[in-house]
């Protein structure tokens, strides 16, 4: 069976990354494409399901996983830990399913070091003006908060060249098509096609 591909997807806040991934998943069968499920020590929110939204663990369990290098990446956010389990990712990839991981540039660097065969995609907004509009459209944040978000977005965007693919999300449908095209091209790589069609190739080359 052909091994699935791990896709690392990063973008500044407001670039439409989460919306693109969710739209992609709706067009792909579950046996082809899934989104990574992280471990976290925070408490479940109403409606969240263990194993579907997150793997909920306590602090001792999380630290034990850190001690045995069980995470591809992990970080602490507002007193809670979040991490991507190597075992959970590898189990899904072994079934031939592609996995999408929504993560920032720092986490992406950690993962590329441990899984160099992962493919990475960076999503940019079409302009700073449009990014500012999207950030303001989310809620009634103060100018100070918006300025901070914009500064964080610029810092995130400065790492775009570390990625394999670049998508500019100007028109959503076009950006979604670009994302699908990347997946299609990766699935046609020789290494995956050779595994997928091994029996056929053997028959074609037989005397």
Swiss-Prot record:
ATP binds at residues 11-18. Residues 4-184 form the Guanylate kinase-like domain. Its main location: cytoplasm. GO terms for cellular component: cytosol. One of its GO terms (molecular function) is guanylate kinase activity. Its EC number is 2.7.4.8. PROSITE patterns: GUANYLATE_KINASE_1, GUANYLATE_KINASE_2. Pfam families: Guanylate_kin. Signal peptide: none annotated. It is an enzyme of class 2 (transferase). It catalyses: GMP + ATP = GDP + ADP. Keywords: ATP-binding, Cytoplasm, Kinase, Nucleotide-binding, Transferase. It comes from the Bacteria. It is found in: Cytoplasm. Essential for recycling GMP and indirectly, cGMP. Belongs to the guanylate kinase family. This is Guanylate kinase. The lineage of its organism: Bacteria, Pseudomonadati, Pseudomonadota, Gammaproteobacteria, Enterobacterales. The gene is gmk.
């Amino acid at each position: 069976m052909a091994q699935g591909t791990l896709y690392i997807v990063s973008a500044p806040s407001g670039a439409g990354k989460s919306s693109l991934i969710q739209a992609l998943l709706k067009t792909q069968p579950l046996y082809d494409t899934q989104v990574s499920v992280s471990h976290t020590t925070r408490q479940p929110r109403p409606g969240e399901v263990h194993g579907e939204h997150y793997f909920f663990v306590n602090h001792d369990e999380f630290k034990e996983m850190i001690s045995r290098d069980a995470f591809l990446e992990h970080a602490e956010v507002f007193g809670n830990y979040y991490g991507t389990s190597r075992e959970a990712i590898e189990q899904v990839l072994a079934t031939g399913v592609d996995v999408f991981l929504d993560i920032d540039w720092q986490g992406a660097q950690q993962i590329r070091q441990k899984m160099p065969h992962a493919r990475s995609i960076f999503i940019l907004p079409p302009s700073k003006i449009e990014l500012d509009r999207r950030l303001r459209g989310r809620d009634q944040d103060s100018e100070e908060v918006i300025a901070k978000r914009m500064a964080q977005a610029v810092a995130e965007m400065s790492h775009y060249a570390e990625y394999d693919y670049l998508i500019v999300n100007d028109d959503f449908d076009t950006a979604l098509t670009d994302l699908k095209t990347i997946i299609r091209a990766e699935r046609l790589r020789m290494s995956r096609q050779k595994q997928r069609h091994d029996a056929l190739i053997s028959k074609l080359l037989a005397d």
